[in-house]
């Protein structure tokens, strides 16, 4: 992504703005709380990955704190999803996502310990974390779409565009961090025919325009 270093800071600012947009809508649409929690879960997992890739290259304490904040925020969102009595998703669907998140947290903990103990990452463990993170977030996205369809709640199109843009940008940040700081970037980015970062940037711009319309 040839201009990623120029885009990353504006994208981060946009993520914060879009998150506030979604949270504001949450207060107005009580039936949308379950979706908002799933949204928060996806965002914070990507932010934790983004911070971890940077931490793996520097062992910087501030970056480690960002990882912890991301994981804790995702954990809070997951607890809300698990504790919800909305009935939007089945217990089995929620438990599947929760188990996947438990595996993700375990791998994140192991990877952090490797960096702290040895001063550099274990590439095999990093690849496992990347694969688990991608699988987990794919599942979360599938469940989010299913929850939208089955909840019977009318969602605001602008909020949905904002959420989609925020998740996409958080994913882009994590992918770019993987490319910049580790040799497992291809594992995280997936197959060669996956949408490129440049294409994702165009998709983000389109979603952002829809959110602002």
Report residues per predicted region.
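N-terminal extracytoplasmic segments of bacterial inner-membrane proteins
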Residues: 33-62, 69-72, 104-109, 154-185
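Extended amphipathic alpha-helical interaction segments
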Residues: 118-213
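Heptad-repeat alpha-helical coiled-coil/4-helix-bundle sensor or tether segments in soluble regions
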Residues: 65-128, 132-135, 139-142, 198-213
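Short, charged/polar, low-complexity loop and linker segments
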Residues: 28-29, 50-54, 145-149
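Bacterial N-terminal signal peptides
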Residues: 13-21
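Sec/Tat signal peptide C-region and signal peptidase I cleavage site
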Residues: 23-27
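Bacterial N-terminal signal peptides that target proteins for export
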Residues: 2-12
